[in-house]
Amino acid sequence: MDEAEDGAEDADRRREAAARRYLANPSHGLADAAQREILAETLAVLADPAFAPVFGPGSRAEVPVAGVIAGKVVSGQIDRLVVRPDSVLIVDYKTNRPPPATLADVPALYWRQMAAYRAAIGQIYGDRPVRCALLWTVGPRLMELAPSTLDAHAREAGLV
């Protein structure tokens, strides 16, 4: 094993230990079984190479967003924001059980939430397309949201 692999394994062990400590905090009120389930889902997401861009360079966690769009105040916290020279990706984690099978099954509330985030982030990164996706922790699976449907929800919310 080379030094880089050893360092990566050490980082993985530290991440898992930190997650265990966090979940075990009595203030969360999580039973042991729930802690194990959440930990397993979280580690599966982080270990899946398909999600590497969401957690790699250029990505940020828990990004607060606030703005006034078409006279309406929009605020929230983006779970992951990936900023690249040619695009921006907004990712929100969802834990629905079972997760929706298709875009048509995604609750309207999530569409509105992501449409609002997209409108706010679009004011900052107006020179780049802003994409949105939901990361379902069960599976795990990344579901990119259709821009046309996001646009429709933004119109319904009076954000355009």
Model-derived segments and spans:
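Structural signature of nuclease core domains in nucleic-acid processing machines
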Residues: 1-160
